[in-house]
Every structure is written in C-alpha cells, then in structure tokens.
Amino acid sequence: MKIRPLHDRVIVKRKEVESKSAGGIVLTGTAAGKSTRGEVLPVGNGRILDNGEIKPLDVKVGDIVIFNDGYGVKSEKIDHEEVLIMSESDILAIVEA
C-alpha cells in the first residue's frame, strides 16, 4: 500500500463484523452494521507539541484498535482497498491478546 500518513494520523483497515440475528442467522457486511474495530496499517511520525517536540504515537502497525467512527474519520480507497484515515485521538483503545 502506497500511503504515508502525516503527523498524528493513522491508517486503519476496518475489520468486518460478524453477528447473529435473533433467529441465529449469521449476518456479515452491511447487514451486520459497520465495525468500529480495525487493524492499524501505516502510522505518522507523531503529534507535534506546542513546544515543537514530536510525541511518538502509542499505536503501532499491526495493532487491533477500537475507534470512534465519527466526523474526523475519512474513508479512502487505496490500491482497490478501502481504508480509514484518522487522528490517533479517534482511537479509543488497543485490543490486547
């Protein structure tokens, strides 16, 4: 994938949700709703602080994260693959194994 996020931006690939209906039918894709979990792909070099220093990001490539799918999250198609571009502040948690 040829994309390099800047500053505190993170590229995330949304994980597909699998859920079951009340009748036990497995729902996937749009029927299941949009997932707010994803895998972190490239990350920027960090957030620029008021004093000019760069604070490295807490998330790293390969992390599974839970994110806020709101106003600041941008959806883009890169190399025929849909990805999300967001600030690290849009990430709510890192899922640990």
Curated annotation (Swiss-Prot):
Pfam families linked: Cpn10
Protein name: Co-chaperonin GroES
Keywords of this entry: Chaperone, Cytoplasm
A GO BP annotation: chaperone cofactor-dependent protein refolding
Compartments, record wording: Cytoplasm
The organism's place on the tree of life at top rank: Bacteria
Coiled-coil regions, chain positions: none
Function in brief: Together with the chaperonin GroEL, plays an essential role in assisting protein folding. The GroEL-GroES system forms a nano-cage that allows encapsulation of the non-native substrate proteins and provides a physical environment optimized to promote and accelerate protein folding. GroES binds to the apical surface of the GroEL ring, thereby capping the opening of the GroEL channel.
GO-annotated cellular components: cytoplasm
Family to which the UniProt record says this protein belongs: Belongs to the GroES chaperonin family.
Quaternary state and interactors: Heptamer of 7 subunits arranged in a ring. Interacts with the chaperonin GroEL.
Chief site of localization: cytoplasm
Listed PROSITE patterns: CHAPERONINS_CPN10
GO MF annotation: an example: protein-folding chaperone binding
